[in-house]
Every structure is written in structure tokens, then in C-alpha cells.
Curated annotation (Swiss-Prot):
Gene Ontology MF terms: pyrroloquinoline-quinone synthase activity
UniProtKB keywords: Oxidoreductase, PQQ biosynthesis
Recorded metabolic or biological pathway in which this protein acts: Cofactor biosynthesis; pyrroloquinoline quinone biosynthesis
NCBIfam families: PQQ_syn_pqqC
Family: Belongs to the PqqC family.
Catalytic activity: 6-(2-amino-2-carboxyethyl)-7,8-dioxo-1,2,3,4,7,8-hexahydroquinoline-2,4-dicarboxylate + 3 O2 = pyrroloquinoline quinone + 2 H2O2 + 2 H2O + H(+)
Protein name as it appears in the record: Pyrroloquinoline-quinone synthase
SUPFAM superfamilies: Heme oxygenase-like
GO biological processes: pyrroloquinoline quinone biosynthetic process; sulfur compound metabolic process
Superkingdom to which the source organism belongs: Bacteria
């Protein structure tokens, strides 16, 4: 469950072009994206208890509510107006705007339906330590690394539509406490994630001009996959293997 904050990449082929970099990015996603994690296989296959699904949704909320914080930091890294304008819609996608709901609102619909107290969810007091450390590391990464790497770290969205579709169909099929309204967050991301990923990919293809910069882009994606994988490692250790750390949420069916 280690989190490597400075991953290194030794590509099998030289990153001597944007196409070579994109091929490598897609290889990284195929090998490292968290759709391969055993916890997701359990979740989508209907093999978790209601309490385990509660634990997943509670911990994932910290990631969801931190995404607009991360995006605000990304915006602050750029002097050019065009990039800031392009990135700004991501804040509204998650935070919402006056009179419209955002992704955080839709995630709270899910936690409400699972029977979690909304104040408890929003306080994030019951999340796993590894969840907090991994998500905070992501926010710090986009703050501390280059603007190019900040954008590149978002490229996991290239692989997100598949897992969202799998989650929608799997959870609707297997859990009687889930319905289409509850899954609205994932339904919306089916259209939002490809749009965001397309822009980020175009950006890194244009702005990563040297083999070193292309390697940095690939390393940023590796880092982000580690952030996602670490969260699931922690959930599996705590709620499947039963090693819940002190102070973390304990579902009723584990008490």
C-alpha cells in the first residue's frame, strides 16, 4: 500500500514523439488503472455487504470533494487565460453553480441512499488515514510539480468511462439499495470524463516537446494511478480483511 511520490519510468521505446508518448500513456492505463483492483471486482460483482459499500462511498467522498480543490490549484498554475477558462468548467462540474447541482451533490445522493448521515460524510472524520494521505498527496502534486505534470495527472480520465459504465450496470444488477437516481454521478461522468480527457491529452501532446517532458507526463499518470490504487488497497485491508484502524468508520455489519 506504498505511495511512491516520485515514480520513475524506463520506457521500452524512446519517447521521441507525441504518438510514442500517447501509446505509453495508454499502456500505463491498461496495466495500472484501478479498474483492475480486486476491491472494484468485488464492488461491481455484488460481493460486498451494504456496510462495505458504505465504507467505499464514505471514503470516496473525500476524493470527490477534493477534486475541485485540486482543479482550483491547477488553474492557479497558469498565466494564460485560455487554459484557465478551459479548466474552469471542472469546478462547476463538481461544485455545481447557483441553481444547479454538481458532482459532489450527486455523490451525497449516493451516501444518503446508503443510510450514511450527511453531516458525518461531509465532516470526513471517519475516513481511513490512507485515503486522506493519498488524496492530499494528489492536491500537493498538482501544486508542487510543473503545470504540465499537473494536467498530465488528470489523464486517468482517459480510462474512466469504462469503469463508470461497469459500475452502473454491476451495482444496479446486484444491490437492491441502488437505483438509477443513486447512480446519477457516474451517469453524468460518462459524458464529462471524455471531454476532460480529450483536452488534457491534446495539451500534453502539444506541450511535452522533449523526451524528458514526455517521460514526466507518463510519470504523472503513474503517480495518479498510485493515488487511486492506494485508496482501494486501504479499503480492502480495512473492510474486506477486517483491519479497520482506530477512529475510522465501522459499519453495523462489522460491529
Amino acid at each position: 500500500m506504498s505511495l511512491d511520490l516520485t515514480p520513475t519510468l524506463s520506457p521500452a521505446r524512446p519517447l521521441d514523439s507525441a504518438d510514442a508518448m500517447e501509446d505509453r500513456l495508454r499502456e500505463i492505463g491498461a496495466a495500472r488503472y484501478h479498474d483492475r483492483h480486486p476491491f472494484h471486482h468485488l464492488l461491481h460483482g455484488g460481493q460486498l455487504t451494504r456496510g462495505q459499500v458504505q465504507a467505499w462511498a464514505l471514503n470516496r467522498y473525500y476524493y470527490q470533494c477534493s477534486i475541485p480543490v485540486k482543479d482550483a490549484v491547477v488553474i492557479s498554475r497558469f498565466r494564460d487565460r485560455a487554459t484557465r477558462v478551459e479548466w474552469r468548467h471542472r469546478l462547476e462540474d463538481h461544485d455545481g453553480a447557483e441553481g444547479t447541482e454538481g458532482g459532489i451533490d450527486r455523490w451525497l445522493v449516493l451516501t444518503d441512499a446508503l443510510g450514511l448521515d450527511r453531516d458525518y460524510v461531509e465532516a470526513t472524520d471517519g475516513i481511513l488515514p490512507a485515503t486522506r494521505f493519498a488524496v492530499d498527496a494528489y492536491v500537493h502534486f498538482v501544486r508542487d510539480q510543473s503545470p504540465l505534470e499537473a494536467i498530465a495527472s488528470c489523464l486517468t480520465e482517459l480510462f474512466a468511462p469504462h469503469i463508470h459504465a461497469e459500475r452502473i450496470s454491476g451495482m444496479l444488477a446486484h444491490y437492491d439499495f441502488v437505483n438509477p437516481t443513486v447512480m446519477a454521478y457516474f451517469q453524468r461522468r460518462l459524458s464529462q470524463a471524455p471531454r476532460d480527457a480529450d483536452y488534457a491529452l491534446r495539451y500534453v501532446r502539444e506541450h511535452a516537446r522533449t523526451p524528458q517532458e514526455r517521460a514526466a507526463v507518463c510519470n504523472a499518470l503513474i503517480f495518479k494511478t498510485q493515488v487511486l490504487w492506494t485508496q482501494l488497497d486501504a479499503l480492502h485491508h480495512a473492510y474486506v480483511l477486517g483491519h479497520v484502524p482506530p477512529g475510522a468508520f465501522v459499519p453495523e455489519d462489522m460491529r
